[in-house]
């Protein structure tokens, strides 16, 4: 089985990508067209198209379009999805949470996938919020265009097994709620909140 996971940033896409890879035994291809990340980490930069193993999962973000794709008439994901058996769209309805997460990590410049607390907001960055909003609008547009339902972060990471089961049912992938829950349990979320005490 080949799965394409298209997501917005800070939506739990890495956790879901690793979960499906582990549960289904799939080869991982993580953000192959994220050129900035790959150059910084000095990792393999793939040219499109590249051969995929038969059982694999590819995680990509909506803005990651390969440099080799030049068509103005064909949407890149419309073309690429033909190489996959399943396509999952992942987004988050709370754009403020995405903004705060991205804003925090852009300031501290540490690894994205770690626990953190965002307690003191930095100066508001209008261009960052616009970028997040545009990505959100794109995935909603693409969902409507392709007839692929969006899996919402708020459902998948809710801790509610009924909501998680509905996500799995939409994917039409044979995995159990309990297996997936081990990964999407909200107690494992990256962002931590300071408990307020009443005086």
Model-derived segments and spans:
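PAPS-dependent sulfotransferase catalytic core
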Residues: 1-54, 190
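A structural signal for short, well-ordered beta-strand segments and their strand-loop junctions
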Residues: 5-7, 27-30, 56-59, 87-91, ...
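Residues within well-ordered alpha-helical secondary structure of globular protein domains
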Residues: 22, 166-170, 186
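Residue-level marker of structural boundaries
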Residues: 25, 104-108, 189
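Residue-level detector of flexible, active-site-proximal loop/helix-junction positions
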Residues: 33-35, 62-64, 155-157, 184-190
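Conserved nucleotide-sensing/catalytic segment adjacent to the nucleotide-binding pocket
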Residues: 41-77
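PAPS-dependent sulfotransferase catalytic domain
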Residues: 62-174
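C-terminal accessory extensions appended to soluble enzyme cores
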Residues: 172-199
């Amino acid at each position: 089985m080949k799965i394409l996971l298209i997501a917005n940033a800070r939506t739990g896409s890495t956790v879901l990508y690793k979960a499906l890879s582990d549960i289904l035994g799939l080869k991982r291809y993580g953000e192959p067209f994220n050129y900035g990340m790959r150059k910084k980490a000095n990792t393999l930069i793939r040219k499109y198209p590249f051969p995929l193993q038969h059982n694999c999962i590819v995680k990509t973000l909506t803005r990651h379009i390969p440099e080799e794709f030049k068509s103005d008439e064909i949407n890149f994901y419309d073309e690429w999805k033909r190489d996959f058996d399943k396509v999952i769209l992942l987004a988050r309805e709370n754009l403020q949470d995405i903004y705060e997460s991205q804003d925090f990590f852009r300031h501290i410049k540490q690894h994205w996938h770690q626990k953190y607390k965002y307690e003191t907001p930095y100066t508001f960055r209008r261009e960052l919020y616009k970028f997040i909003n545009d990505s959100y609008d794109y995935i909603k547009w693409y969902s409507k265009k392709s007839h692929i339902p969006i899996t919402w972060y708020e459902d998948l990471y809710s801790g509610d097994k009924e909501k998680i089961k509905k996500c799995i049912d939409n994917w039409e992938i044979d995995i159990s709620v309990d297996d997936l829950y081990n990964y999407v349990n909200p107690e494992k979320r990256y962002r931590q909140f300071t408990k307020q005490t009443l005086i």
